[in-house]
Swiss-Prot record:
The gene is gltX. It is an enzyme of class 6 (ligase). This is Glutamate--tRNA ligase. It comes from the Bacteria. GO terms for biological process: glutamyl-tRNA aminoacylation. It comes from Lactobacillus gasseri (strain ATCC 33323 / DSM 20243 / BCRC 14619 / CIP 102991 / JCM 1131 / KCTC 3163 / NCIMB 11718 / NCTC 13722 / AM63). NCBIfam families: gltX_bact. ATP binds at K262. One of its GO terms (molecular function) is tRNA binding. CDD domains: GluRS_core. The lineage of its organism: Bacteria, Bacillati, Bacillota, Bacilli, Lactobacillales. Its EC number is 6.1.1.17.
Amino acid sequence: MAKQKIRVRYAPSPTGHLHIGNARTALFNYLFARHNKGTMVLRIEDTDQKRNVEGGSKSQMENLHWLGIDWDEGPDKGGDFGPYRQSERKDIYNKYIKQLIDEGKAYYSYKTEEELEAQREEQRAMGIAPHYTYEYEGMTADEIKQAQADAEAKGLKPVVRIHIPENRTYAWDDMVKGKVSFESDTIGGDFVIQKRDGMPTYNFAVVIDDHLMEITHVLRGDDHVANTPKQLVVYEALGWEPPKFGHMTLIINSETGKKLSKRDESVLQFIEQYRDLGYLPEAMFNFITLLGWSPVGESEIFSQRELIKSFDPKRLSKSPAAFDQKKLEWINNQYVKKADRDVLLDLALNNLQEAGLVGKEVSPEKMEWVRQLVNIYAVQMSYTKQIVDITKIFFEEAPELSDAEVEEIKKDDARPVIEEFKKQLNAIPRFTAVQVMNAIQATRRETGVKGRKLFMPIRIAATRSMVGPGIGEAIELMGKEKVNKHIDLTLKQLSDLGL
């Protein structure tokens, strides 16, 4: 017997930007499909018209592509199992709604929202978990038909509910959690499978789509666990075999230990936000993979090819995944340091232009200068937008020394070192990094000062920073006129402080 070909799906709702959690779902499905040489389907679940955002699906697809996630079938690619938008599959859903009604497994319900809420309030007052109770209890078929006709005459629009069998256990062997089960009396009563506007509910449409699209494995977030028994009710009613389910654990804020919520503004949560900051897609792909999945060994840096080769759902964690911003920055920095310099240049130049530090029209000479700036500061950048803050001194007038910089210079008698360096700097034949280092060595010989006591005062006076790339390269790019101005301002400030 031939091995069943794996088919997975990522099925977002077009309700906004691509969230980290949704990106993880797409990524794990992608890795699972590619590892097994299977098929990945993209399906747009847009039945909730009120929540849909114009351009939402296009934005999500664009950000998935940016991350390096592609799919084999979808609304933009077609395929043998389309349409791939739920809003275009209404006739398909109606066919199965009718089948269930004809078989007596589903029925029209005319209870109004006010009646349902009153029922829930009464149940709460009695200490009972709110649930729907069958509105035709004890009625004959003719009486039910008459009650429905009366409701229609009043202009009431029905929903369609599916019968939940009594005293049943719905269980599955979860790819992440292991054995999971629900009793039928905990599901909340007969639930809606078609809304008053004629659109199917999520838990009905997803079953129809997964079955007809021959989905074999469903990897999704932990928040869908409670949906699974409802979907199993539908599978059973239609006589279909369900796919294998795997529910990934929650993502929590590593600082607070609380579930990552879109209302938590302490963490950027949308892929587009990280794109705007200049994070690299390969780094984001790497980081998101580690949110709830553990590789073999200690390494944390992997190429996409390596992750596809090694991905095994058995290594998905049963514990919540901690979103650690510092770890993301560290991972991205590893990629920045080895990234193609043309890619970094494009990102950093865009950041500098958005900040108004570089004009929209850039001459070849200016472009080469920015390229060198990016090259020497790449090692410091967790993401490329940081270049705006760490290189502002190259574009703006020098600020006064900070208190920390003054304290650093005060540790030793730095004035003679700074004055001698200015003298040596203005004596070099060419203003290059090599010649700048020669000037520093000449300062060492003339003053007898070496090590940190030599380099730190020079770095602070010339570049207005206590950290940075090679001091020779930084001073060369800053230019002779600007460096001299910085040194003069430093000496004046020291004089004003009586130093």
